[in-house]
């Protein structure tokens, strides 16, 4: 539902709590009694993908705005993110947030992988950095396994 409906349900006691995006509430003029949570946003949040026929006027125009270096960094980050999720048998519906960020402007630069795993009553957070994407995935997977984070994910199944 929309924000009005959610707030009404909260105030009527139908909900114990709700989680809303602060940016949206502020933009819509809601002044709420709230608490800001510090957590990772979903990977690729705000990413826009376009697909068009090669050689068309629109593809030529878009190519002028397209930063190939940034694309390589974001693509590698998403590949790292997806590989890590596969390694830990998680998917986009799992109670985990993962962010892979490239340091610098080149695709083979150093990357940082941060993840948060949410159980019902606790969570685990870790961050790993390495210049080799495959090694980074291995380090993050080892950290996940060493800290029994799978147990937290399994609480939701």
Residue ranges of predicted features:
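Small-molecule-sensing regulatory modules
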Residues: 2-157
């Amino acid at each position: 539902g929309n924000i009005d409906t959610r707030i009404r349900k909260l105030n009527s006691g139908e909900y114990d709590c709700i989680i809303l995006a602060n940016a949206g509430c502020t933009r819509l003029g809601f002044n709420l009694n709230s608490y800001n949570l510090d957590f990772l946003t979903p990977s690729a949040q705000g990413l826009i993908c376009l697909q068009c026929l090669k050689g068309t006027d629109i593809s030529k125009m878009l190519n002028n705005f397209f930063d190939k270096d940034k694309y390589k960094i974001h693509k590698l980050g998403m590949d790292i993110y997806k590989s890590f999720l596969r390694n830990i048998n998680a998917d986009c519906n799992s109670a985990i947030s993962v962010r892979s960020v490239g340091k610098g402007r080149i695709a083979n630069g150093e990357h940082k992988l941060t993840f948060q795993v949410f159980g019902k009553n606790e969570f685990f957070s870790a961050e790993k950095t390495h210049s080799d994407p495959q090694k980074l995935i291995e380090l993050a997977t080892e950290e996940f396994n060493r800290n029994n984070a799978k147990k937290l994910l399994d609480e939701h199944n």
